[in-house]
Amino acid sequence: MQTTKNQDDLVRIFKAILKEERFGSQSEIVTALQAEGFTNINQSKVSRMLSKFGAVRTRNAKQEMVYCLPAELGVPTAGSPLKNLVLDVDHNQAMIVVRTSPGAAQLIARLLDSIGKPEGILGTIAGDDTIFICPSSIQDIADTLETIKSLFNYAE
């Protein structure tokens, strides 16, 4: 058994372990990683990795609470282009709606709020995968819409 393995191996095996959907505690994950040869792994490292990769506790097919990585979430990383998280941009006479990948709406809304009024955005409300954008001026909603579309390289 190897005593040290590199970070890429750790990440790959960590994700594979979570896909099994059978580990209900962080200590069980630590034990499984140690069995794979990662002797320097501990609970705090596992906790940080669970956070980093967006792992959640959910019920598996046997109704047991286990850690898993939601497949559809597509957890944004520092290297993820934000434009890939925006799925649709639409509007009516008063509001702009942006649909995102699940879990990405608050990240995108925060970005939109940061550019704010100079770009025609009065404010945003974000759920899990939908953002409502209130334009600064209804008369200029078309300009605000174009600003948002260009920000995310969105083309219909």
UniProtKB/Swiss-Prot annotation:
Signal peptide range in chain numbering: none
Compartment list: Cytoplasm
GO molecular function: arginine binding; cis-regulatory region sequence-specific DNA binding; DNA-binding transcription factor activity
GO biological process terms on file: L-arginine biosynthetic process; protein complex oligomerization; regulation of arginine biosynthetic process; regulation of arginine metabolic process
Record key words, sorted: Amino-acid biosynthesis, Arginine biosynthesis, Cytoplasm, DNA-binding, Repressor, Transcription, Transcription regulation
InterPro entries (UniProt xref): Arg_repress, Arg_repress_C, Arg_repress_C_sf, Arg_repress_DNA-bd, WH-like_DNA-bd_sf, WH_DNA-bd_sf
Pfam families per UniProt: Arg_repressor, Arg_repressor_C
Listed pathway(s): Amino-acid biosynthesis; L-arginine biosynthesis [regulation]
A GO cellular component annotation in the UniProt record: cytoplasm
NCBIfam families (alphabetical): argR_whole, PRK05066.1
Similarity remark: Belongs to the ArgR family.
Function (record text): Regulates arginine biosynthesis genes.
Protein's UniProt name: Arginine repressor
Species of provenance: Shewanella oneidensis (strain ATCC 700550 / JCM 31522 / CIP 106686 / LMG 19005 / NCIMB 14063 / MR-1)
